């Protein structure tokens, strides 16, 4: 069956919408984004990860095997993406397992939340992603629609997520010192996107081991509840944000600190977050905080930059997306997950670019 890929631009935000059967859709996406995928593979600071994979080939292949067996759909998606882009599968696999090998993965991120219904995410990554990251909506046959901020070449699961079930989350990368031979964390996160509720998503994360570490700050449109889930190996910590302000950077706050290696930069950002004092918290305040106090610029020894900011009001269902150096895009969460370009265009008073 035929898959379709449509490229749009609303204001400063690129938005790719893919429809069709799973493997055909990912093959078409790979072909569409082939040049950007090659740019990413050529530009990633890969030597520490490559060295670790070569030193620990048994671990690398064990993580691959667990990913394939436990998350066959996501594994098939990555296989089709590589084939469509015309790049070696192992190159994409290594890129997607960067954070599962104990060598650091070159990503960061910050999540802020205010109970019961505000959730904000800064997507921090390597400069190679600047200008080629974009919104990606996946409309895979028989599955809920999913919208993410996408890094070309990566499974669409390691950044922030909005689904047609109203699930919303942002992910912070956490470097696990001694990974277990479990499935790659991108694969686990992709499986979680099929959940219909926060409780189901948490259950998926509890029941699926992850070699690397992720921290999820999640909620659901129309449901006044926020939770933070930290995941590494077979360990899971779930914290409900009952009231007030919550934050997370790139080290664990609930799981044992012996599991991860906290960078000085993550600790410094955490200190900034801990001293943020929202007087009248709303979506505008979250956008302001994320685009100023903890915004990163790949300078002064920091290798990463903030590529986008995404803030969701779970009460109203409105999402604000701010690409690096660009103006904000407003959208309803459901419209992003459904790929409703007309609705989002109308809300922003713009003409979509093809």
Question: Where are the language model's segments positioned?
Answer:
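C-terminal, well-structured catalytic/ligand-binding subdomain of enzymes
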Residues: 1-87, 98, 115-354
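Gly/Pro-rich turn-and-neighbor structural signature
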Residues: 90-120
